[in-house]
From Swiss-Prot:
One of the primary rRNA binding proteins, it binds directly near the 3'-end of the 23S rRNA, where it nucleates assembly of the 50S subunit. Gene3D superfamilies: 3.30.160.810, Translation factors (2.40.30.10). It holds the Pfam family Ribosomal_L3. NCBIfam families: L3_bact. One of its GO terms (biological process) is translation. It comes from Alkaliphilus oremlandii (strain OhILAs) (Clostridium oremlandii (strain OhILAs)). InterPro entries: Ribosomal_uL3 (IPR000597), Ribosomal_uL3_bac/org-type (IPR019927), Ribosomal_uL3_CS (IPR019926), Transl_B-barrel_sf (IPR009000). The gene is rplC. GO terms for cellular component: cytosolic large ribosomal subunit. This is Large ribosomal subunit protein uL3. GO terms for molecular function: rRNA binding; structural constituent of ribosome. The keyword Ribosomal protein applies. PROSITE patterns: RIBOSOMAL_L3. Keywords: Ribonucleoprotein, Ribosomal protein, RNA-binding, rRNA-binding.
Length: 210
């Protein structure tokens, strides 16, 4: 099990060895700094804490600055923790780069999906609309609600209009197509959540081979 934090650059396409065009997402993986190593003996579980992105020291509070100084790294914009079976080979202050993964690896990628604001039930929940003809009084509404004397209330969980998107989404079992070590790029097959420049968490797939 291993993981990195990266930033989505965008999508493009590549040719595989058979000449087939495949859609790919390019992810920039700046050097990830290990800010803390957690062990079962000390913390109850094995994990590494990774810092990503630069931030001005003036914008870091004293406890956080002490945490970064202890690890011997410059202040980082975001921190992410990855649970591991073993922390052997990891030390505080160590830099992790794109070559942590290799072509052919399967990964799970998590990010915050694009926000779409307040949306109705047709766009938000994929419901069917009513007839659009002149005689119909029902077009794009949510449908049956609280009925009459019974149940005379709207059931919890009823699919209604509301805020859509801007939530944590994980896409599983994406294949790493190419690793560009010189430019710190990770190229994966398919689409990943979020807008361009959005932060992504890349983990070893938990469903490998399934």
């Amino acid at each position: 099990m291993k993981g990195l934090v990266g930033r989505k650059i965008g999508m493009t396409q590549m040719f595989d060895e058979t000449g087939l065009v495949i859609p790919v997402t390019v992810i920039e993986v700046e050097a990830n700094a290990v800010t803390q190593v957690k062990t079962i003996e000390k913390d109850g579980y094995n994990a590494i804490q990774v810092g990503y992105g630069q931030i001005n020291e003036r914008n870091v509070n004293k406890p956080s600055k002490g945490h970064f100084d202890k690890a011997g790294v410059t202040p980082k914009r975001s921190l992410q923790e990855f649970r591991l079976e073993s922390t052997e080979g990891f030390t505080a202050g160590q830099e992790l780069k794109a070559d942590l993964f290799k072509a052919g690896d399967k990964v799970d990628i998590s990010g915050v999906s694009k926000g779409k604001g307040f949306q109705g039930v047709i766009k938000r929940h994929n419901q069917s609309r009513g007839p659009m003809a002149h005689g119909s009084r029902y077009h794009r509404g949510p449908g049956s609600m609280g009925a009459a004397s019974y149940p005379s209330r709207v059931f919890k969980g009823k699919k209604l209009a509301g805020h859509m998107g801007h939530e944590n989404v994980t896409i599983q079992n994406l294949e790493v197509v190419k690793v560009d070590v010189e430019r710190n790029l990770l190229i994966v097959k398919g689409a990943v959540p979020g807008p361009k420049k959005g932060l992504l968490t890349i983990n070893t797939s938990i469903k490998q081979g399934k």
